[in-house]
């Protein structure tokens, strides 16, 4: 038998590879797009939903149903007030919106943008108090009114944490509900009612009970579970989930308070975004998904997650494992809802909260001016701080400081460099001037300025009168100073002040996470834009 000589194809493979490489280079130089995606999906075939973070647990059911009807469903989650901003800026990317409360659809600049809105389930926003604390206050198995909560706060017997009034749905609707009830539960809240001095004093007293504020509802849950707090305001379904976790760990659950004179109820509407009214197939897909969300199977699924679907929240046959009576949840009682005011009144009420009602804050910004910040980094820092501190700029996004707020600036490199302070939170011209003349140089030490910030807050701030926050921005690894010095100071002084951090450049996130874990805080990503990061962290104080 004669063996045939095997051909060597290696040279041919090399030649073909070279030709393909040459082809790609030439086409790229011509500016053509070579996106050969084997999993390519026509954008027109995708059904995009912009949805509240409160619905994220239901994503897979919606996506699976989309597959059943031949629709590729993509869901993006944001905070409710952020959804309003996104849709006002550009709604063309989305086909439907699932938001926590219909009032935010009314806040859209284009009142004709959404159609076919229907409530899917309802979700009250209430206060949960450790049951032993609620018993001591006389709230267990009793009719509780909003004035009872107010009196407990005034007497120093009740403190709580909540999410931002100006950046989250739970914060905003809880505020509007309490505002409405303290105004005497009128048929409709008016602008004139917002001018009542007694009402303003009651609201200031209510917010004096705030210990911490979160910029989003999800982090509020983490803050509570990781901290030493005994009350919080949140969604009913979230408080149920928290109680399930607490009891599974052998810890004391929260007792939910439903004031008989009114609670904030969210109707969670699912609505069509009519960007292209001629696309009948798209609208048909929307109607199918909406009908599925309102189907018995999905309603049962959502009830098991702690959402209600019954008129007035009443259902004597509700799942008692989820809607546990021992946690203060009584589904045989009608929930007294409020009628939300007009768009104009809501806007005025939010501005009133910022300027006059919320508990003042003292924020210490620790700003890295080490040598690595030279150039673009320092320029971005100056722009971001000017935006946050300038009243006119910040007020466009409801981020402005009020007259009663305090602001301190600690600049640092390998040591604390300078300290600047404001007497009034809305008079920041001198601080902005000093920031814009900062020079970069030296090494990086994030620990000494953090201790300095805590010292400033301890020496100048009363916990009962102010919320306290440290915001640290750095672009590098701390090569001097010691984390253990911060840890020692924090524990010796029984600190509870959050130390938030913003990453930039080549900052060492592990060092920043240590500070966040120590103080029950979090780290924000400023690498894609310092201005956006400072805006986000601002909503946490």
Model regions and ranges:
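A bilobed periplasmic-binding-protein/Venus flytrap-type ligand-binding module shared by bacterial periplasmic
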Residues: 126-133, 266-284, 301-305
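Von Willebrand factor
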Residues: 356-421, 427-473, 501-511, 532-533
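VWA/integrin I-like adhesion module and closely mimicked acidic/polar interface patches used
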Residues: 251, 474-525, 535-537
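N-terminal segment of the mature folded domain
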Residues: 37-157, 161-164
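Acidic, polar low-complexity linker/tail segments
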Residues: 9-12, 30-34, 311-364, 371-379
């Amino acid at each position: 038998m004669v063996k045939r000589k095997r051909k060597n194809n290696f040279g041919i493979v090399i030649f073909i590879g070279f030709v393909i490489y040459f082809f790609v280079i030439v086409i790229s130089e011509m500016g053509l797009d070579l996106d050969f995606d084997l999993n390519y999906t026509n954008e027109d075939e995708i059904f995009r939903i912009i949805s509240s973070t409160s619905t994220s647990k239901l994503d897979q059911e919606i996506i699976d149903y989309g597959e059943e009807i031949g629709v590729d469903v993509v869901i993006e989650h944001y905070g409710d007030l952020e959804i309003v901003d996104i849709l006002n800026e550009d709604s063309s990317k989305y086909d439907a919106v699932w938001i926590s409360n219909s009032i935010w659809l009314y806040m859209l600049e284009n009142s004709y943008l959404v159609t076919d809105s229907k409530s899917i389930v309802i979700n009250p926003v209430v206060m949960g108090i450790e049951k032993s604390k609620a018993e001591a206050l006389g709230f267990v198995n009793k009719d509780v009114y909003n004035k009872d909560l107010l009196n407990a706060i005034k007497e120093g017997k009740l403190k709580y944490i909540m999410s931002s009034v100006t950046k989250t749905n739970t914060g905003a609707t809880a505020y509007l509900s309490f505002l409405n009830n303290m105004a005497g539960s009128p048929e409709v809240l008016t602008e004139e009612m917002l001018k009542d001095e007694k009402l303003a004093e009651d609201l200031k007293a209510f917010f004096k009970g705030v210990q911490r504020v979160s910029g989003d509802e999800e982090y509020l849950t983490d803050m509570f579970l990781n901290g030493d707090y005994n009350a919080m305001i949140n969604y009913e379904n979230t408080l149920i989930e928290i109680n399930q976790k607490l009891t599974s760990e052998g810890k004391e659950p929260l007792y939910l308070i439903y004031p008989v004179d009114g609670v904030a109820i969210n109707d969670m509407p699912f609505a069509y975004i009519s960007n292209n009214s001629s696309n009948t197939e798209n609208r048909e897909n929307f109607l199918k998904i909406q009908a599925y969300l309102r189907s018995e199977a999905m309603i049962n699924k959502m009830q098991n997650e702690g959402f209600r679907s019954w008129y007035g929240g009443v259902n004597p046959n509700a799942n008692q494992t989820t809607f546990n009576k021992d946690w203060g949840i009584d589904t045989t009682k009608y929930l007294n809802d409020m009628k939300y005011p007009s768009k104009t009144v809501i806007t005025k009420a939010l501005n009133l909260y910022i300027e006059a009602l919320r508990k003042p804050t003292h924020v210490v910004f620790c700003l890295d001016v080490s040598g690595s910040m030279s150039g673009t980094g320092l320029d971005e820092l100056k722009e971001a701080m000017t935006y946050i501190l300038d009243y006119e700029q910040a007020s466009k996004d409801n981020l402005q400081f009020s007259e009663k707020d305090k602001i301190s600036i600690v600049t640092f490199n390998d040591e604390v460099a300078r300290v600047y302070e404001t007497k009034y939170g809305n008079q920041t011209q001198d601080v902005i001037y000093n920031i814009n003349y900062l020079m970069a140089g030296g090494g990086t030490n994030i620990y000494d300025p953090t201790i300095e910030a805590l010292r400033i807050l301890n020496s100048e701030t009363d916990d009962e009168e102010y919320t306290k926050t440290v915001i640290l921005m750095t672009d590098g690894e701390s090569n001097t100073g010691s984390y253990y010095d911060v840890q020692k100071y924090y524990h010796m002084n029984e600190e509870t002040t959050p130390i938030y951090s913003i990453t930039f450049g080549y900052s060492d996130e592990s060092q920043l996470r240590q500070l966040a874990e120590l103080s029950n805080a979090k780290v924000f990503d400023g690498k894609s834009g310092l201005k956006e990061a400072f805006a986000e962290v601002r909503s946490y104080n």
